[in-house]
């Protein structure tokens, strides 16, 4: 019996890293970006200590981006604004879902209940641009084996 070839072609310079290892890379990258983001937010308050923060709970949430690698392989030829929008919507969904799960044990490290453009306490619509860009970064990051080929 002859096996049918996959319809998604993997390019030569593309992801071969095992999923668990990529999960670790995505978790670390997510932590780093969150620490940088929260550090730069301190500048708005004129606090030049630039103290960045994150939560241990965020590591597995960020790590789950590794599971998007098959999607990135399929969508990488689509129009860039369409891809970015799709990725932002997926991140909004992941943020909502992980927020709901962590909320059950009162462990959610973020609270948007006082923010202007929020959907419930877990999603901020004004983060759309952040998630659009983060999704495009993750596409490149996961398809290039995380930190190994970045």
Role assignments for model-derived ranges:
Residues 2-150:
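Aromatic-rich, lipid-facing transmembrane alpha helices and their immediate juxtamembrane interface loops
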